[in-house]
Curated annotation (Swiss-Prot):
One of its GO terms (biological process) is detection of chemical stimulus involved in sensory perception of smell. Disulfide bonds join C96-C188. GO terms for cellular component: plasma membrane. This is Olfactory receptor 2A14. It comes from Homo sapiens (Human). The lineage of its organism: Eukaryota, Metazoa, Chordata, Craniata, Vertebrata. The keyword Kinase does not apply. Odorant receptor.
Length: 310
């Protein structure tokens, strides 16, 4: 490399500090979780594409959420499983940086898609007469494309700042994958600016969207309480509670990981929390939506019935 930057070539990822038998068990569990993530989100995406009754803005964005969850998990889980099965857990420097970039980008996309989904529920419940104009297919397409493009552009900012740092060791990160705060500890230079940018990005992409979601749902709650029909109120609560569960899991774990004072959460606890945030959320999202959503369950039953008839 040019200039005074020194680059390490390989990075060592720590192994789980457990015996061989438990390591095999963990490998099996993580493989099962990853398989459930692929199957669950794949089924959600497939049902939404195939069932014309689900061709609505809400399920359009839910299909994007399924794509994000599959991409998010596929970014690091296969490498983590490979490291569990091998004696040496290493990753080259630039693939590690790319893993960090994709980790941030997909997390940003999920934040924005969840905000758009809350706006969709707000428009549907609070402004039903204007819903078709507020959430036309053109608007939905623009919101979806903007969420993806903006998220990847935002993830480029910390990536460029990371690549401007010299990396001369140590060669081991104290994390199970290339998480950005752990990667920064490999730099042999002051990372103050990087940490400030990461915190500012967290405020912008976590706190800001979360406030928008909460405001939307306060308005939604007030509108639901005014609904006269018990069936209509139940359906609205069911749909919104599913979305709130996903929002709580995602934003809650992310804010604790990246914005809570580090003294209150030791590094080992943060590793476990980050693992939960990155491994379990993508698996739980389709379960939450399929178990609590009558329309998704109905579409799944129709698909299974059609399969049996053929």
């Amino acid at each position: 490399m040019e200039g005074n930057k020194t680059w390490i070539t390989d990075i060592t990822l720590p192994r789980f500090q457990v015996g061989p038998a438990l390591e095999i068990l963990l490998c099996g569990l993580f493989s099962a979780f990853y398989t459930l993530t692929l199957l669950g989100n794949g089924v959600i995406f497939g049902i939404i594409c195939l069932d014309c009754k689900l061709h609505t803005p809400m399920y359009f964005f839910l299909s994007h959420l399924a794509i994000v969850d599959i991409s998010y998990a596929s970014n690091y889980v296969p490498k983590m499983l490979t490291n569990l099965m091998n004696q040496e857990s290493t990753i080259s420097f630039f693939p590690c940086i790319m893993q960090t970039f994709l980790y941030l980008a997909f997390a940003h996309v999920e934040c924005l898609i969840l905000v758009v989904m809350s706006y969709d529920r707000y428009a549907d419940i609070c402004h039903p007469l204007r819903y078709n104009s507020l959430m036309s297919w053109r608007v939905c397409t623009v919101l979806a494309v903007a969420s993806w493009v903006f998220s990847f552009l935002l993830a480029l900012v910390p990536l460029v700042l990371i690549l401007s740092l010299p990396f001369c060791g140590p060669h081991e990160i104290n994390h199970f994958f290339c998480e950005i705060l752990s990667v920064l500890k490999l730099a042999c230079a002051d990372t103050w600016l990087n940490q400030v940018v990461i915190f500012a990005a967290c405020v912008f992409i976590l706190v800001g969207p979360l406030c928008l979601v909460l405001v939307s749902y306060l308005r939604i709650l007030a509108a639901i309480l005014r609904i006269q029909s018990g069936e209509g109120r139940r359906k609205a609560f069911s749909t919104c509670s599913s979305h709130l569960c996903v929002v709580g899991l995602f934003f809650g774990s992310a804010i604790v990981t990246y914005m809570a004072p580090k003294s209150r959460h030791p590094e080992e606890q943060q590793k476990v929390l980050s693992l939960f945030y990155s491994l379990f959320n993508p698996m739980l999202n389709p379960l939450i939506y399929s178990l609590r959503n009558a329309e998704v369950k109905g579409a799944l039953r129709r698909a299974l019935r059609k399969e049996r008839l053929t």
